[in-house]
């Protein structure tokens, strides 16, 4: 979202800037993990550009990159916002193109369902094999924007659909695409978080893709994805859609490790104090590692 402001020659608002997203946007060519390890750890120390008395410590984790053949079968539910606020060119039209890109990557043993919401929610595509691309593409192409947003009803139906077609040891995931304008029904962030926290115990992850501008609730979408054991990305053009759904498809859709916690211990003879830069909303306490 901050990238959109910068591309438009605008200073992003403070709450749109999350340092970890800036850092993680780029590819650092970290070495792949060896053996059975799911990730490798890379560290780097450099001078601090804004204070010559300080140092910056960069700690990078590289997850194992899976080939298509190594990826487990996917049970995907596309949960798509087709409310009136999604009518802009960079919302529903871009959303369709993005999910058509993803559809091209699907395999025969993958399954896709499509749930939409706008005033009321509905299942517009029952579970369909990933190699039946024409049917999935047609369902996406028929979508039109209109109505108010009843996001909670859509989320509930999406979880019901994902649970009914659950693949044991597979990738069971809801992909919510929206501008975040939940304005009807259960709309407070705390209520949505409680619902998603309850549902994540079913083994279904929730990933969120943000589209558009103006009323897009950036921080809210990140919080919901965090509580849904999923990830979050912002798509503002077709090139970004290719990055998320083609170049980084494995990282977007597949989980290689759960409940990963990182604890850093500094040598007090060399480090007097430190400050965490980025991921401030994920900071853990010592007792969280017990």
Task: Label the model's feature ranges.
Residues 19, 24, 63, 157, ...:
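Hydrophobic transmembrane signal anchors and adjacent membrane-proximal interface regions, especially
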Residues 11, 18, 129-130, 168, ...:
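Short, solvent-exposed coil/turn linker segments
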Residues 5-11, 207, 287-290:
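Short hinge/gating elements
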Residues 1-51, 55:
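Acidic/polar low-complexity segments with low predicted structural confidence
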Residues 236, 272-290:
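Solvent-exposed beta-strand/loop surfaces of large extracellular or lumenal domains
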Residues 41-263, 268:
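Exposed acidic/Ser/Thr-rich ligand/metal-binding surfaces
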